[in-house]
């Protein structure tokens, strides 16, 4: 039992962070305090403030503290620890994806593209956007308004004539000399930059001036092009403006809570435009106040530096925060400029907070409906299989094209549905092409032939396939030499049947040695179809990426002595990869930088 008196006798009154551990030496809670002794003493009073705190204190076996120089430093360290340890009594933001941006590169002929992750590429970044779909939509729009290139540099550097994008008026073809001057191209780049910065009126003023000058010079064809561009830009501006009032860069955060589920809805506004919105469903311990939830969300959301998120000038929330000053100070330090958190909004901005609140309520209602349905599906599957409680399910599928670029996927469901952070793909190598049994065996060994934490052991493993695939899976598990209980998972084959029609699947249950055909309206079948389809889609998308990578590689990458510059020279002088393949050894040797010996090596590699 934890001796709180003995522990508290050695705690100082400094600011800092504390970590509470249970009997398994797992961090169960992380907190911070401006006075560690005072804060930690409050946990061991006779009358605790909530059942959540009572349950937490009952689980404590030891506590560690870290002294910091300030409250701000403690706040940052607290969020780093929460991110690292994922304690069960803390509010946890489960979405861990970095946000996508639009990147305008810094080159002679800049390109515009999407970017996610660390900002290593030199250029200007615009965003963040709430999801990849918003970036794709904006890029498509920009291409229609301002015809600048979006192609990769490898494509740009090796073109001898303009591509289809030039033919349909979506690129000025800077890749081929004589089609557009650097000045004209960079003018369109400037328009795109101003547009992304929200300076739409400047874009219009420039275009109107160009149109009028072309008209005065009797160049009516050029004037008509500018007129069409002006109309397109005006049409977009009318749709994108939030209001006539110019708004600061801001995020608006609203929270809805019901039946143990919280929805945090974020509305992103940049340069006076709504870039989009997104709903989050953090894991919230019982009896957590919504103010605490908001504070924790803001901290985790903006202080995870590796996410590449931009901190806006203003963050608007729908409730008062106790740690508002500390959060503002920390976010200001992180951003390198003044950041304000506003919790008492009036006037025009209040209607956007109301909009965020409406969206939070709507998203929560949908989530509750889906959670209820998933619960019913789990309940029916548990009854069908005679399992008291299903906590975790995993499903495997194989994807390839004619035995090439084989990928195996593993998707994971918990009681709330898909657990995408645990999804995995496996490259399958060293097998006969098209041997799905061998591919499944390799995938299962990669997944399970290692130590697993107790909560990571699945209750059910679905194998997308018939008896053959299931028998191969059983063989793998029989041969596993692992410490965890390999007999716990139920291995179930999902066979499509003779007609391979959806709804006519046969379940082959290994432990019960029986086969089941469920009716089309079975909730258990719907759950199985959901996880099977997720696995199928995950495998196909991974296979397509691998196939596309193989397709786009020239075949020169693996030849020793052929680096990026020599590869580029070969493609340029011989007219692309087909020209390289058709070239004789002497023709290859005539390319600058390619010796006779290297030409022989290249020729042999491509033809043998």
From Swiss-Prot:
- Which key words are in the record? Cytoplasm, DNA damage, DNA excision, DNA repair, Excision nuclease, SOS response
The record's listing under SUPFAM superfamilies reads: C-terminal UvrC-binding domain of UvrB, GIY-YIG endonuclease, RuvA domain 2-like
State where the protein is found. Answer: Cytoplasm
UniProt key word Transport: no
One Pfam family here: UvrC_RNaseH_dom
Q: Which GO terms describe its cellular component?
A: cytoplasm; excinuclease repair complex
GO molecular function annotation: DNA binding; excinuclease ABC activity
InterPro entries according to UniProt: GIY-YIG_endonuc, GIY-YIG_endonuc_sf, GIY-YIG_UvrC_Cho, Hlx-hairpin-Hlx_DNA-bd_motif, RuvA_2-like, UVR_dom, UVR_dom_sf, UvrABC_protein_C
Does the keyword Cell inner membrane belong to this entry?
no
Pinpoint the GIY-YIG domain residues.
13-91
**What does the record list as GO biological process?**
nucleotide-excision repair; SOS response
Q: Which domain of life is it from?
A: Bacteria
Q: Where is the UVR domain?
A: 201-236
How is the subunit organization of this protein annotated in UniProt? Interacts with UvrB in an incision complex.
The UniProt entry's sequence similarity note says: Belongs to the UvrC family.
User: Could you tell me what this protein does?
Assistant: The UvrABC repair system catalyzes the recognition and processing of DNA lesions. UvrC both incises the 5' and 3' sides of the lesion. The N-terminal half is responsible for the 3' incision and the C-terminal half is responsible for the 5' incision.
Protein's name in the database: UvrABC system protein C
Source organism of the structure? Mannheimia succiniciproducens (strain KCTC 0769BP / MBEL55E)
Point out the gene that encodes the protein. uvrC
